[in-house]
UniProtKB/Swiss-Prot annotation:
Record field: catalytic activity: D-erythro-1-(imidazol-4-yl)glycerol 3-phosphate = 3-(imidazol-4-yl)-2-oxopropyl phosphate + H2O
Family in the record: Belongs to the imidazoleglycerol-phosphate dehydratase family.
The keyword Lyase belongs to this UniProt entry's keyword annotation: yes
The keyword Amino-acid biosynthesis is annotated on this UniProt entry: yes
Entry EC no(s): 4.2.1.19
GO cellular component: cytoplasm
Metabolic or biological pathway, per its Swiss-Prot or TrEMBL entry: Amino-acid biosynthesis; L-histidine biosynthesis; L-histidine from 5-phospho-alpha-D-ribose 1-diphosphate: step 6/9
UniProtKB keywords: Amino-acid biosynthesis, Cytoplasm, Histidine biosynthesis, Lyase
Primary location class: cytoplasm
Organism: Agrobacterium fabrum (strain C58 / ATCC 33970)
Subcellular location(s) of the protein: Cytoplasm
Name of the molecule in the record: Imidazoleglycerol-phosphate dehydratase
Source domain of life: Bacteria
Length: 198
């Protein structure tokens, strides 16, 4: 099987982002965005998806974290799309309820080629430490749009905002792990009656 790796370098007046992913990795990561909480979340995304990720970001953090988070999501999504290629042989669909202490979050994905995010997650505070909670949605919107996936994220319940955010990243990681796996019964076919995913 061909290597499923993708690399994206994205430079704008706001950020400089370098992302390398290996879909068939072991969950190793090297992450530096300048935003501590975000680094922690991306480490969870890599570890639990088993997608190796090497992410280096320099952003306009003197303004806020928004551009850094959004542009990182864009680049990760593009790198995943590049690594998956025409998506032959993949499982395509996955869904999961993930528990962490008092919190339960559901994620479902269709690696469809049709980007869409359904987001039903509410935080009880605007920040986790210094990190804006609204940026969690911004990240997943950018990821879904640029990876070409349909992604649903639903928080059933939870009291701790850190746990709510973390279960979003871990649940998405786990469904990406399953949906990107090669299904040997597909025998290299594109998993769609249309013959393509778009």
């Amino acid at each position: 099987m061909a290597e499923r790796k993708g690399e994206i370098i994205r430079k704008t007046n706001e950020t400089s982002v370098s992302v390398r992913v290996d879909i068939d990795g072991t969950g190793k990561s090297k992450i530096s965005t300048g935003v501590g909480f975000f680094d922690h979340m991306l480490d969870q995304l890599s570890r639990h998806s088993l997608i190796d990720m090497d992410i280096e970001v320099q952003g306009d953090l003197h303004i806020d974290d928004h551009h850094t988070v959004e542009d990182t999501g864009i680049a990760i999504g593009q790198a995943i799309a590049k690594a998956l290629g025409d998506r032959r042989g993949i499982t395509r669909y996955a869904s999961l309820d993930l528990a962490m202490d008092e919190t339960m979050t559901k994620a479902a994905v269709d690696i469809s080629g049709r980007p869409f995010l359904v987001w039903n997650v509410n935080f009880s505070a605007p920040k986790i430490g210094t990190f804006d909670t609204e940026l969690v949605r911004e990240f997943f919107q950018a990821l879904a749009q640029n990876a070409g996936i349909t992604l649903h994220i639903l928080n059933h319940y939870g009291a701790n905002n850190h746990h709510i955010a973390e279960t979003c990243f871990k649940a998405v990681a786990r469904v990406l792990r399953t949906a990107t796996e090669i299904d040997p019964r597909q025998a290299g076919r594109v998993p769609s009656t249309k013959g393509m995913l778009a």
